[in-house]
Amino acid sequence: MSHDGIDLDEFRTGLADSVLREIAEHLAALAGSGATAAIDLRSLPLTNADRSELESRLGRGEVTVKLDVAGTSELWETRYSGVWWVRHFGDGGRIASERIEIAAIPQILVSHDEDIAAAATRVREEVEAHGSA
Amino acid sequence: MAPRETIGEELLRHGISRRALLKYSAYLATMMALPPMASRAIAEALANARRQSVIWLSFQECTGCTESLTRSFSPTIEDMIFNLISLDYHETLQAVSGAAAEEARLTAMRENKGKYVVVVDGSVSTKDGGVYSTNAGKTNLQVLKETAENALAVISVGTCAAFGGIPHANPNPTGAVPVSDIVTDKPVINISGCPPIAEAMAGTIAYLVTFGKLPDLDALNRPKAFFGDTIHDRCYRRPFYDKGLFAKSFDDEGARKGWCLYEVGCKGPVTYNACATLKWNGGVSFPIQSGHGCLGCSEPNFWDKGGFYRPLSTSTGGGATVIGGAAVAGIGIGVASALISRRRRTDATKEPKS
């Protein structure tokens, strides 16, 4: 995005370096003790260039997931196992929440116990309805 | 009355998975500057909470605040707020009208006595008994007193409800006052702005539902999560201010190069709001990014400060100094007591000198 001579896409503040150092510490902790962590990227004054730099240096790994709940979300594991980029979109496709999660798997991907119980009921009803037809 | 379902139960009944709450929790944590790892605990708290009864009263206002909150056209993360609350009364949005509408308000007040939240947009007319703004045969003043009496808390959305706003501007023909001048015996949260940022309204309500307490407030009773920094502090043009590079008019070289708008009247340095970070219209832009200085619409008496295009360094009748001082003091004070902050607010909203 360019505005009157300021190109916000090109302006780097150096924050990408800082975030990478923080990720490195958290990932070492995950590897050592299993401690999970998260970094809220929206709370940091990242420019578009900073975000692009961070995204590029973390790269993309083997897993990419698209979520469709309360709007869309995109998650991917970076090329560093255990480092996940989690991006939730809001109204008009803007980024509503964006975080780096350092975990074996982001919490939002895990099926919740109550959802599993409700699904078990629903699928039983489906089987019974089909059987009585 | 049968107890309301928990939010988790209701979402489950509608086939919405717990992931929706986890996602909203991440969004809420971002908005309210909460620790990112708190998301899971927030989601659990929300799942076990009951929908918050909300009564929305519209007084001397333009409906811009409601427009700001409901501007979304497709199901998005922002809409989740409507799964967390039971909007029991809202004149613009409710389907019923007339006596049935008023009965809905009275029913919600009766069934949720001491637990409902009152949201007000618009200032309150007090002159001649408040006759200049009435609805259903009652003055706004009467309805506010009656509705707030057994409320848990009151949220004043928009600068009109928070500080009197444009109806309060000189010569204030209706005797308009902010809600906090009328409601003095319970918490009043101010979400100022003309209009306020939707996330600030939704985030504050969601925080109340989740934690059952008020968020940290500044000296003007505004949530610090949204009003903790000035526009100037978070402005992408700030480096030009620091270098002394200013636009002198709206069509000069400085304006074309995107330099700081301080000298063409920007009120960013004394205006506390989150426009520079959350932005508007789905995060597209905010006034300064569009080439116009901040008007200071989230501060008291912004309409009467001597001109939108006059630099702050010229006299503005003392208003800017008072506001800047009060707001800076607020950061040091932390969560101000209602009495102290009310006194400061009264100082800041006093009639400007002509």
Residue ranges and their predicted role:
Chain A
Residues 1-53:
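N-terminal domain-onset segments
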Residues 23, 39-41, 65, 86, ...:
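Generic structural hydrophobic/aromatic packing signal, biased to beta-strands
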Residues 31-33, 57-58, 78, 92:
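A generic structural signal for short, solvent-exposed coil/turn residues
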Residues 33-45, 63-72, 132-133:
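Short glycine-rich, low-complexity/disordered patches
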Residues 49-82:
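Amphipathic, interaction-prone secondary-structure segments
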Residues 73-133:
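Helix-rich interaction surfaces within compact, conserved domain-sized segments
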